[in-house]
Amino acid sequence: LDITAVNLKVFKHLIDNWTFHSNIVLPNEKHDAPNTDWVRLSLSLDNGKQITLAPEGFRKHEYRGTFFIEVFTLLTKGSKICSDQVNFAVDLFESKHFQSPEIMFTNSSVSFREDERYFSALARLEFNHYLTK
């Protein structure tokens, strides 16, 4: 499984289509929360399983994963911009099906919270990744 290819495909789709003025933070990137809006991205994949019987080189494997998009907006801006950004991100992937690598988004959920500095929204986008080997 080449998780790098999955990461690149998913992250690139969001970054290429993002229309808001928020800093985007990738996994394992050192980051101090700025005094501005920002978005944190992360992705996880399970170990997967073989889903077809076939000779070697033609066996299809399925991996399930979750893409996390966490949006932070300053309290002084109100909660609407946070909601708009996370909903835009979810809409970018709703029922999306990529080829090479094959990735199909299947489900999403969003939760909101606030702390002393930010409104934040966490989108969990579930997907299946298929690989033939």
Predicted regions and their residues:
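Alpha-helical context
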Residues: 45-47, 58-69, 101-105
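Acidic-leaning, charged glycine-interspersed low-complexity segments
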Residues: 20, 87-133
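Small/polar-rich, solvent-exposed N-terminal microdomains that initiate assembly or binding
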Residues: 1-59, 77-80, 84-88, 96
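Oligomerization/assembly interface segments of phage tail-like spikes and tubes
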Residues: 59-75, 119-130
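Short Gly/Pro-enriched loop/turn and capping motifs at secondary-structure junctions
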Residues: 74-76, 111-112
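Sterically constrained small-residue positions within well-ordered secondary structures
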Residues: 32, 60, 112-116
